[in-house]
Curated annotation (Swiss-Prot):
Claim: Acetylation is one of the keywords in the record: yes
Region described as Interaction with alpha-actinin: spans on this chain: 325-394
Modified residues (N-acetylthreonine): 2
Protein name: Catenin alpha-1
A single BP term in Gene Ontology: cell migration
Amino acid sequence: MTAVHTGNINFKWDPKSLEIRTLAVERLLEPLVTQVTTLVNTNSKGPSNKKRGRSKKAHVLAASVEQATENFLEKGDKIAKESQFLKEELVAAVEDVRKQCDLMKSAAGEFADDPCSSVKRGNMVRAARALLSAVTRLLILADMADVYKLLVQLKLVEDGILKLRNAGTEQDLGIQYKALKPEVDKLNIMAAKRQQELKDVGHRDQMAAARGILQKNVPILYTASQACLQHPDVAAYKANRDLIYKQLQQAVTGISNAAQATASDDASQHPGAGGGELAYALNNFDKQIIVDPLSFSEERFRPSLEERLESIISGAALMADSSCTRDDRRERIVAECNAVRQALQDLLSEYMGNAGRKERSDALNSAIDKMTKKTRDLRRQLRKAVMDHVSDSFLETNVPLLVLVEAAKNGNEKEVKEYAQVFREHANKLIEVANLACSISNNEEGVKLVRMSASQLEALCPQVINAALALAAKPQSKLAQENMDLFKEQWEKQVRVLTDAVDDITSIDDFLAVSENHILEDVNKCVIALQEKDVDGLDRTAGAIRGRAARVIHVVTSEMDNYEPGVYTEKVLEATKLLSNTVMPRFTEQVEAAVEALSSDPAQPMDENEFIDASRLVYDGIRDIRKAVLMIRTPEELDDSDFETEDFDVRSRTSVQTEDDQLIAGQSARAIMAQLPQEQKAKIAEQVASFQEEKSKLDAEVSKWDDSGNDIIVLAKQMCMIMMEMTDFTRGKGPLKNTSDVISAAKKIAEAGSRMDKLGRTIADHCPDSACKQDLLAYLQRIALYCHQLNICSKVKAEVQNLGGELVVSGVDSAMSLIQAAKNLMNAVVQTVKASYVASTKYQKSQGMASLNLPAVSWKMKAPEKKPLVKREKQDETQTKIKRASQKKHVNPVQALSEFKAMDSI
């Protein structure tokens, strides 16, 4: 390795190395490599008995190689003449290429004259290798000349930063800053170009991070240096200036190392390196448990698997013992760890029983499935433990900062020091939780971003504290105030970046489940505080509820931006709007009234029931949002504890409960349906699969049309959605909990069917074709009939009886009838939509009009969906029923219309 220190520029370069570090060199070298390889491979089958002679193809290829090399020489000469750096090395490299080119030309000519000679082929291959090495070295030298140019610019910036830090007067400071800014901008452009060309992803990330720090911190160094000059007696300003200068030095080193594609001396230069350790360990463990029984050896596999599992359990135990982990969550993690241990022992026993066999037995396959399920359950509890931390820590993240700033503005240095400790602990907690979220995430790119953001937040924390201490020392100083505002803004911006990054690597389903439980806890604390007349506790807890609700709304709204607009997003956004526009204002009003009543002397009476109702509505609003978000999840994606097990156990212990029949006899009808025996569940699943086929037909039908001017399509979608909820109920899933909910849903379908009947008859009345008219009326009669059937079947009697010591669940026949009626209705709706369109076209042809012009019925093809500029990747998206806009296959209107050609026969 040669280190060139020209003008204190640390230029690391190994003259013997032919390692290609940039994409540009690869691109330039590729055509020549292809041509040389093609020439070398010409007639490569060895000696031939055919008549010897000249090879036209070889001569042509040799000429093309010669031409390509001449192009390199021409460019190389130009680079060597124009380059300010490595001039001698470049000239020598060009001459070496010219020499190797002549040798290659001679060897290729001889080979072309006698392509069957192995000796001449060998000579040409050696000449080709030497030529490629010479050209590669020339390109690498040219590349390093560019790097040297960047390092010279980097040295200018580094010197400028030092001059800015050491400026003795404000005038000198202004001059130095004005001179430095264009140099930093120039460096940023050069570094960005280099970043794009680097082959190694780690070096690209390192360059990007260093550029960001440089761009952000140069203006801050100017402000900090200015404050030092105006208030030389305030030590906090000097400390801040030195911290920022140190960060800039690290950024300069980072750019230098990344540009030369060398390893960093400091691990902190790679804040985004690595993935989720615990997630990786669990994934690796899941792979390790699958072994060929023929090669299984207990002595080899048992210690290895047990050691891996204990390492995972140690990581899980650390998470369980953390301060933010709830007691019930800690117990569940411990239980899952024990279950995983037991599952591993059972699996190893099965492997021992299968040792030496060619194929795995059913018992062994079951043990593997059980082991995988237990690790999946442990993952789920760890994810939710992380979400406990995220939900608590990333709540009202600006409060410690605002308190610190307020104390600084008042000039109270003692308070500032106290609040600085609180602020530091808060920052450390954010960083700790962010790293916890990383440990259980499989999103490698997301983890990099979180760790990079956390690293920058950690560096910013002492700077914010120093700015507050400086303001407390000079509270009247305008510069001190501006300095504080600058750091406050930087902190808030960085926290937002970290929050969004953490949200990207965590599951929205886990977030909503945990937020729902936390809000329920807080709601009950609020009620208790009200009953105990604890004003501070009431106000503080109510603030936490408002913060949690606002966070839920923000996260869910951001998530919906990733989906194409449709029924699903409309329902979710409708639930968020209800919470933000109606529920939360009412809750805030009740809290303010309660605080005012309790704070007055003497305390004024207030309506406790009103407060409890407002609090309950907050919980219900969060729950409704969560149910709306989960509507598109498949049963496999939903947690076992999503509704039943957590819901009823938790709510039965609380002081705030809804007064519906969901808790009568301890279980809802939906929960009872979930307890059906496997045989009966299989029968229902068969019916549901048949129903899903009809639903797919309806989805295909309505997706063709723009529903903005067509109430028939709108009604069809609504009926489909409600029928899906009803069939989900029969499987113990979905938002409908009891028979009363199902009956209510059936009534809604009947109302929609009645409206569709009215619209359909209007179309039929205008249709001149009697056959089409009769078909449409027949389908409308079917809708009325099946709506009536569905209404009858909706009265599902789900009961649990104890017969002979065995629990027997009734209601299967009713459930089967319900699904069958829904399937029949779905089919009738599909046929009605088709017949309505056909009848409309007949009317158009008869009257010679562009459209039917009926109110609320306009048949227009649905416009292609807009695609987002940036697609956010999500894991396990393949099973999602509603696809992302960027993934959805759009239907060709001409193709869609062609499907109606057969409809004339209806």
